[in-house]
Amino acid sequence: MSDQRKVQTWVIVGAVLGATLFGCFVFGVITAAIMLPVFTQAREKAKTVSCMSNQSQIARALQMYAADNDVLPAASQWADKVKPYLRNDYLFVCPSAKQLRCGYAFYRPLSNRKVSSISNPAAVPMLFDSSKGQFNYADEGQSLDLRHLNGAVISFVDGHLKWFKESDAKALFQKRP
């Protein structure tokens, strides 16, 4: 085989290998582009589950406080009042919140209310995702933060909690308990 023939063979082999490697690279890029949103959404769902766990524990602590004191805490002190009922302060931090401070707010109309005076505890919000990032923050839903897949986690007076999309979440705060 002549040297020129060997060079031509190697050029063809190199071209085939180059095209194959380029094809694999393109396939990898396309696959990554398709899978990235899937992984991002899965990570956000995991953060939502973690937030729900945090809120569930805080809601239980609020219920224990109410059972011990016959009323829910004052809105201006709710976080301080439930701290003794919680394992640690990290429960106040939502994993999806922009700042590492309190990610939740107390529903102000419940301040110093007896749970028995609330006609439908399963329909009245008690704790919700808040954009304020302050301990002991309370309002009437104005700071509601839709940080979980365009929705919010809301805990109710009866202790259950749920993720709500924007329109449904905001509607919960239109009625007074």
Report each predicted region and the residues it spans:
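Active-site-proximal beta-strand/loop segments in catalytic clefts of secreted hydrolases
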Residues: 61, 68, 94-97, 128-130
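Extracellular/periplasmic catalytic domains that process cell-envelope and extracellular macromolecules
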Residues: 84-88, 111-121, 145-148, 155
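Membrane-embedded alpha-helical segments of small multi-pass membrane proteins
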Residues: 8-34
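Solvent-exposed helix-loop boundary motif
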Residues: 87-106
